[in-house]
Amino acid sequence: MEKKAHFVKRDFPPREAPSLLLLLLVVAVLLLNALLYLYLGNLHGSSGRADAEPSLCPYGSFKLGPVKNCSPWLSCEAINREVRKLKCVGEGAVKKVFLSEWKENKVVISQLTKPELKEDFLHGLKMLKALQSKHVVRLLGYCEKQFTILTEYHPLGSLRGLNETLHIPKYKSMNTWHRRLMLAIDYVSIIRYLHSSPLGTLVMCDSNDLDKALSQYLLTSDFHILVNDLDALPLVNRSAGRLVKCGHRELWGEFVAPEQRWPYGEDVPFDDDLMPPYDEKTDIWKIPDVSNFFLGHVEGSDIVRLHLFDIHAACKKKDPAERPSAQEVLDTYKKVLTLLIREAAMPSTREML
């Protein structure tokens, strides 16, 4: 009697399907983390430029536009001969600013307006020369005897116009919590750079209200931030017992740090000689207010604020010694960005399963 071959259909045990799904989830999460690592590394380095010199040229030279070769900073003679003023685009307490042209490139000329403020102007030039980096507007040349500075032109202007810029159709895609948080990270990176600069610990004094603070920075066409005005950057030197005061007048308002306000009450007239000096932690006090401006009121910005609540509360400690350093704030901002991008990507990962 012949035996018939029996073909038995074998199903996977019920437990194997969940195991396979779990394996797929682990692979997807690992892949997501790898992509996130590369993405964030590109973002943090895409302001792109190393701390030393934005155009990768030797100190005292620059590259502009598509030109491959580095040019030395323009001298008095070169500025007078090769740079053509187009129009006045701004005027502050110290200098007047002109949109200009050099070899078919738009550039900016800044010139002293009041001779009695020449020390402030020359201090700003000294800082600009010494602090050239990815955080600082690019210096193209200068003429001390004519009180003239030549810098790179950024058509989007100062940060005061950020919200208006983000409502231009061309830039509406940038109006997201992610891009706005990246701007806040750029800002804190600049404060961190100033507090640990090659010259020592520098305090951003030209920032007694939000509008004034924003006017010190430029928005680049690729949506990064550069500090532009360095006229008021006093040096803190703890080892020598040297603290600073931002000017010689009384400061008011909630934007400035408590230690910057007159401590002896309204009954005692302000006297600069009696005003106690302070350190760089005044800049830390202002970070939450500036970042709140950056975050705006777009979808997701309140979630970002929630994640930043603790570090911002620490920035607002009345005792300056209890406030975090700029590096600690920067580290927290970057961690929050990483966390929120990962959380935003997770729904897509779940859909894959």
UniProtKB/Swiss-Prot annotation:
Lumenal compartment segments? 41-353
Subcellular location per UniProt equals: Endoplasmic reticulum membrane
Query: How does the entry describe its membrane topology?
Result: Single-pass type II membrane protein
Decide whether keyword Endoplasmic reticulum is in the record: yes
Q: Which residues are glycosylated?
A: N163, N237
Which segments cross the bilayer? 20-40
Q: Which UniProt keywords apply?
A: ATP-binding, Endoplasmic reticulum, Glycoprotein, Kinase, Membrane, Nucleotide-binding, Signal-anchor, Transferase, Transmembrane, Transmembrane helix
List residues of the Protein kinase domain: 83-353
Membrane side Cytoplasmic: which residues? 1-19
- One GO MF term, please? protein kinase activity
Entry-linked InterPro entries? Kinase-like_dom_sf, POMK, Prot_kinase_dom, Ser-Thr/Tyr_kinase_cat_dom
Q: What protein is this chain from?
A: Protein O-mannose kinase
